[in-house]
Amino acid sequence: NFLGTLINLAKKIM
């Protein structure tokens, strides 16, 4: 879902 994508993107940035 959209929220999961945002979290995944944040994890990649960190």
UniProtKB/Swiss-Prot annotation:
Q: Where, by tissue, is this protein expressed?
A: Expressed by the skin glands.
The protein's location, in the record's own words, is: Secreted
GO terms classed as biological process: defense response to bacterium; defense response to fungus; killing of cells of another organism
Record PTM Methionine amide, positions in chain = M14
Keyword set, alphabetical order: Amidation, Amphibian defense peptide, Antibiotic, Antimicrobial, Fungicide, Secreted
One GO term of the cellular component aspect? Answer: extracellular region
What is the protein's known function? Antibacterial activity against Gram-positive bacterium S.aureus. Weak activity against Gram-negative bacterium E.coli and C.albicans.
Q: Which family does it belong to?
A: Belongs to the frog skin active peptide (FSAP) family. Temporin subfamily.
Protein known as? Temporin-1Lb
Naturally occurring in which organism (per UniProt): Rana luteiventris
